[in-house]
Amino acid sequence: MKRSSYILGLLAGFAALAVSCDLTENVQVKADKSMIFGSKSGLELYSNSFYKALPTLKNGFMQDKMCDVGAVSNTDTFIKQGAYNTETATSWSWGALKNINYFIDGCNDPKYCTVDAETRDNYLGIARWFRAWFYYDKLTTYGEVPWFPNNIQSYQNDVMYKDRDSRDVIIRNLIADLDFAYEHIQATSSTGSSTLTRWAAAAFKSRVCLFEAAYRR
């Protein structure tokens, strides 16, 4: 009898435990602004998300396959007449820019960004380098595109659907971003060549200027 009572007590305890545990509870994975912009580690972790925009080693080489660096067996779709139109083109995406501009706006907000100016500007430089990378791709693909210096909210339809800006506006802002990156990115070398240095800003600026000069010639 005592044993039966003991077993029943255990079962009742397990039942109560099962009722009190919410096995479907969602894990909170969203960090607030103070967690991101209030420390160097937060800035570093967020800025790591920008690097996925860079091409892989293979893609970096194959981007030049339309020139004489290697032999290919087919013509790239990019240069085929009529291959792209507004319905089939896949590069008119702005998600990466929203991610970057959110970070830039946060770094410039003293309410949340409480790190020292040198640390802040270092990560601002990294973000602005990637914004330049984003816009260089858009410029070489479409020419004139709208320039968005800040993060846009979903209700700002008048800003979201504004007209395209001129090449002069895009190039001026693009070079300003790269100049800022060169002046403020602290690293001059990278272990494993896996993160940006100030020399990446200088090298990328030379490519941007060469492309635009050749276009305007």
Where are these regions (language model features)?
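Conserved, well-structured interaction surfaces
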Residues: 35-45, 73-142, 157-172, 176-193
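Aromatic-lined, polymer-binding surfaces characteristic
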Residues: 148, 192-203
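Short coil/turn linking the two alpha-helices of tandem helical-hairpin repeats
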Residues: 139-140, 146, 189, 211-216
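Membrane-proximal, proline-rich intrinsically disordered regions
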Residues: 21-62
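Short, solvent-exposed turn/loop segments enriched in Gly/Ser/Thr/Pro and often Arg
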Residues: 60-73, 146, 195-197
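Bacterial Sec-dependent N-terminal signal peptides
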Residues: 1-28
